[in-house]
Swiss-Prot record:
This is Chaperone protein dnaK1. It comes from the Bacteria. Pfam families: HSP70 (PF00012). Acts as a chaperone. Belongs to the heat shock protein 70 family. Residues 491-505 have a biased composition (Basic and acidic residues). Keywords: ATP-binding, Chaperone, Nucleotide-binding, Phosphoprotein, Stress response.
Length: 622
């Protein structure tokens, strides 16, 4: 049987792991290291270099070296080299091929299957791109797994019931997840993150600082010199790492550039305090996803049993201190290597899928709510955010107009109550509905999300059996900034959304009452006394006028509500008048017939029957 590996395809570094005798082992690469830089370069002779060798030659081959390609996954980014365009999938495939070769050399056999990890907040197009990269590299991608989930799997497989917080700050992405572990089940309770926050951003702040200092001292802008910038990036990364263990570092780059006077050298000192000051706002950005996860999971900080730090960037003292502060003074677990834990978890999941690891269940979640637009522009959620996947949910909807021939199903993703403020994922139409009064047809809308997060939507007319399907290949296809916007707006405009929802619901109730009352008047024309009919019709006209007054977004909700209540109150007179007539008719019939105890009893029985009919009628109309 072909071996399956677990791959952590990182922004700055990648790791591959395999199960040996049921235990995960991190594979050493051809250069003897356990991590491989996620760098691809094209040598002048056309040879493709990957990993450490690509990183080493980057300074002298800037234009033909690609790094941090993970940040471009799922986009239309391209690089043209030697007259050929390369996309992110192809670049990532070069890295995956290198990891595959190293694994095959280590194991002495072919490797065809892999579980590849992605940030928890990766959208569907980014996940699809990662899967495609694996396929281009010649791998059968068994599953795309979220990085924090894989980390928890590696950490907690042998643990009793525990609640674990995974704080994952890598080279280019940031995720926080809260998971519950016990009896071989790893269940994600909530997840949040930022797809554009990572160690690269900390490096960039140091680069910007060095450029600024050099310009102030020498009047030369290094930002315009690609080769100098590459040297600065490498020096910045080295300085960042050194400042994790010491309080001061020297950045010395001789012959960084030249001016009319001759060669210029860069020599700067950077203290840990300066570094933390330069990057304070980046650290601040880590707080919101953390608070969102705690809020979404609905737990207290005291309920967190362990904190697991993942990603090389968590080695920065300021990050470790922030996590301790956020978790109420809890020390992070030191028993896991932040660089390797994700790949180990991926190898375990590969073992689960191949049947090598028994009695383990991994339950992941969808990061945002999914639903459809219903009357009044309301977002009706079928699947709430942080719902365990795979999942299937369905709900019965009906038509809003008489003899409606079709219904349009518009699928949205987000947290706002008004559909238009959420992300539209797709739309399709269910046609061929038979003519029927509004509210009669029954249309079942079903959402089905598979284990890879790809969503399928089905609409079925239960009357005719007609069905329409759509696959939303963007089950989570939202850029992180858009997710942030939705979340922030959901909080800022909660009151406004509530008002609009209330207005739409009040309007819907009013329209429904007009429809029902007019239908009742028409069906019982000969039984309703003239003066009662006139009064009811007048109140209906008032309600119609109120409904026409403004749109659902207007501020005449109170007016509509008052008119609706008036119609409801006046409508009661219809029933009273009809039953009064019925009783009078019964009484008259009893008097004309042979008067007797039996007839009187029968008349009483008829009255009782009328009450039961009334109950049924009310239930039917509800």
């Amino acid at each position: 049987m072909a071996r399956a590996v677990g791959i952590d395809l990182g922004t700055t570094n990648s790791v591959v792991s395999v199960l040996e005798g049921g235990e995960p082992t991190v594979i050493t690469n051809a250069e003897g290291a356990r991590t491989t830089p996620s760098v691809v370069a094209f040598a002048k002779n056309g040879e493709v270099l990957v990993g450490e060798v690509a990183k080493r030659q980057a300074v002298t081959n800037v234009d033909r070296t690609v790094r941090s390609v993970k940040r471009h996954m799922g986009t239309d980014w391209k690089i043209n080299l030697d007259g050929k365009d390369f996309n992110p999938q192809q670049m990532s495939a070069f890295i995956l091929q290198k990891l595959k070769r190293d694994a095959e050399a280590y194991l002495g056999e072919k490797v065809t299957d892999a579980v590849i990890t992605v940030p928890a907040y990766f959208n569907d197009s980014e996940r699809q791109a990662t899967k495609e990269a694996g396929e281009i590299a010649g791998l059968n991608v068994l599953r795309i797994v979220n990085e924090p989930t894989a980390a928890a799997l590696a950490y907690g497989l042998d643990k009793d019931d525990q609640t674990i917080l995974v704080f994952d700050l890598g080279g280019g992405t940031f995720d926080v997840s809260l998971l519950e572990i016990g009896d071989g089940v790893v269940e994600v309770k909530a997840t949040n993150g930022d797809n554009h926050l990572g160690g690269d951003d900390w490096d960039q702040r140091v680069v910007d600082y060095l450029v600024q200092q050099f310009k102030a001292g020498h009047g030369v802008d290094l930002a315009k010199d690609k080769m100098a910038l590459q040297r600065l990036r490498e020096a910045a990364e080295k300085a960042k790492i050194e400042l994790s263990s010491s309080t001061e570092t020297s950045i010395n780059l001789p012959y960084i550039t030249a001016s009319a006077e001759g060669p210029l050298h860069l020599d700067e000192k950077l203290t840990r305090a300066q570094f933390q000051q330069l990057t304070a706002d980046l650290l601040e950005r880590c707080k919101t996803p953390f608070h969102n996860v705690i809020k979404d999971a609905g737990i207290n900080l005291s309920e967190i049993d362990h904190v697991v730090l993942v990603g090389g960037s968590t080695r920065m003292p300021a990050v470790a201190e922030l996590v301790k502060e956020l978790t109420g003074g809890q020390d992070a677990n030191k028993g896991v290597n932040p660089d390797e834990v994700v790949a180990i978890g991926a190898a375990l999941q590969a073992g689960v899928l191949k049947g090598e690891v028994k009695d383990v269940l991994l339950l992941d979640v969808t990061p945002l709510s999914l639903g459809i637009e219903t009357k009044g522009g309301i977002m009706t959620k079928l699947i709430e955010r942080n719902t365990t996947i795979p999942t299937k949910r369905s709900e019965i909807f009906t038509t809003a107009e008489d003899n409606q021939p079709s219904v349009q199903i518009q699928v949205y993703q987000g947290e706002r109550e008004i559909a238009a403020y959420n992300k539209k994922l797709g739309m399709f139409e269910l046609t061929g509905l038979p003519p029927a009064p509004r509210g009669v047809p029954q249309i079942e809308v079903a959402f089905d999300i598979d284990a890879n997060g790809i969503m399928h939507v089905t609409a079925k007319d239960l009357g005719t059996g007609k069905e329409q399907k759509m696959t939303v290949t963007g089950g989570s296809s939202l850029p992180k900034d858009e997710v942030d916007r939705m979340r922030q707006e959901a909080e800022q405009y909660a009151d406004e959304d509530h008002r609009r929802r209330e207005a739409a619901e009040t309007r819907n109730q009013g329209e429904q009452l007009v429809y029902q009352t007019e239908k009742f008047l028409k069906d019982n024309e000969d039984k309703v006394p003239g003066e009662v009919k006139t009064e009811v019709e007048a109140s209906i006209e008032e309600l119609k006028a109120a409904l026409k007054g403004e749109s659902a977004e207007g501020d005449n909700t109170a007016e509509i509500r008052t008119a609706t209540e008036k119609v409801a109150a006046v409508s009661q007179k219809l029933g009273q008048a009809m039953y009064a007539d019925a009783q009078a008719a019964q009484a008259a019939g009893g008097a004309e017939g042979a008067a007797g105890g039996e007839h009187a009893k029968a008349a009483d029985d008829d009255v009782v029957d009328a009450e039961i009919v009334d109950e049924d009628r009310k239930d039917g109309a509800a």
